[in-house]
Amino acid sequence: MPGVLLWFFKGVIALLLAFAVGLIVYYYLEIRPIAQTALQSASFWLSESPQTRFLRRAAAKIHPKSYTARLLYTQAGVDGHFRIAIWVFWLDSLYRDDELYAMMLAQAYYGRDSQGNAVYGTKNAALTLFHVPVTEMACQQQVQLIYMFKAPSLYRPGSARLVESSKHYMTLCQEQIQQ
């Protein structure tokens, strides 16, 4: 019996080591090459202006962290959920929450414009979809813009569906006014 337990213990240790080596290899092959680029693209959103702080806070309330990983890593396939779980692990390990939400604001997919071109990033989406720079948007428009990347094909600027669905988060505007 002790021989079986020892054999089982060695097997568990070997599996854990293989998993750890797999995570490290995955980090160096998939995550490390884009980690700094992603953070550099989010530099505007990491500023401490009241508006960028508000947008990061609104993004944190509207979208959970696992959704952030899905936005940053969108490869379809059977192993998609497993890869998203690994990305969540690495993202939580490498970045603060502010950095994660800044990257999300910088790189989120907002659907297609009227010419059929893909729209990425909150600054670009504000100009393309709302025809206003993000710094000049009303609070309600900012909340709607952040809400839109839940499902860009369902929520279009000015649509009744977007207004109704984002209504719950309009309390964020009241909080911003009070601060």
Curated annotation (Swiss-Prot):
SUPFAM superfamilies: Lysozyme-like (SSF53955). This is Uncharacterized protein YfeL. InterPro entries: Glyco_trans_51, Lysozyme-like_dom_sf, PBP_transglycosylase. It comes from the Bacteria.
